[in-house]
Every structure is written in structure tokens, then in C-alpha cells.
């Protein structure tokens, strides 16, 4: 691949609305929008809570559910923080709110010994920081 060609990698954070409140928590966590579950972590799914459920339904399933009201400002600030973090991989980063970043990686593939290694490095580091990411 010619390193002068643009190549964009999208980092999608499907659980960012949950992870802005807690990233390393094994408790069932839900994020509400108008008293409905909009986002939930895997422990919440595992006990049977579903997206779209009312908060009262979630509490009926388990009184150990931790709930937060969605905070889009907090999500944007975290996305901006993550964008700053990705500058270690490329100088070209674009925010695509509400839950994604675009990284221009065409010029840095050689440095990271290819796309597979770059994706693995980014994924491993984000996982260690407590984020769920899809690329």
C-alpha cells in the first residue's frame, strides 16, 4: 500500500454513554433517557434487562442495578479526551460524535508494522483503559 494514500480507521465506542460513568464495574449499569434504558453494560444484559425497558422494570429484575441519566456533554468531553489520546498513533483525528473517532492512518502503517498490528495495539490499550471499541 502506498503510504501517501489516505486510509481512515473508525473507532466506535458503543458503550461510551455507560463508560463515562463507570468502566471497570461488574455491577449491572444502565443509562436512562426519559426513564427508559437507552444503554446498558453486559452485566445488565446478563440478568435480563433490555434496551427500552423502563427503570421500574430494571429494578424489578434486580435491585442492584446502578442507573445514570444520560449526559451527552460528559460523553463529548470523554470523546475529546480519547481523541487527544489517539494522537500517539496519528496526527489526523476527527471527532464524529456522539460515539466515534476517525483516525487517518495511511501515513503511520509502516511505523506500526501494518493495519493488523495498529488495530491490535489500539484495541488492547483501549480495553486496558476500560473502553469497549469496535473498529
What are these regions (language model features)?
Residues 1-102, 107-109, 113-124, 128, ...:
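Residues that scaffold, gate, or flank divalent-cation-dependent active/transport sites
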Amino acid at each position: 500500500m502506498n503510504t501517501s494514500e489516505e486510509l481512515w480507521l473508525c473507532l466506535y465506542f458503543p458503550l461510551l454513554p455507560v463508560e463515562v460513568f463507570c468502566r471497570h464495574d461488574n455491577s449491572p449499569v444502565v443509562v436512562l433517557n426519559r426513564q427508559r434504558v437507552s444503554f446498558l453494560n453486559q452485566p445488565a444484559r446478563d440478568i435480563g434487562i433490555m434496551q427500552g425497558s423502563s427503570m421500574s422494570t430494571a429494578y424489578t429484575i434486580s435491585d442492584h442495578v446502578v442507573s445514570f441519566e444520560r449526559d451527552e456533554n460528559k460523553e463529548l468531553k470523554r470523546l475529546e479526551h480519547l481523541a487527544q489520546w489517539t494522537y500517539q498513533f496519528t496526527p489526523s483525528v476527527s471527532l464524529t460524535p456522539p460515539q466515534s473517532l476517525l483516525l487517518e492512518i495511511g501515513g503511520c502503517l509502516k511505523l506500526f508494522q501494518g493495519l493488523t498490528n495498529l488495530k491490535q495495539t489500539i484495541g488492547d490499550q483501549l480495553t486496558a483503559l476500560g473502553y469497549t471499541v469496535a473498529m
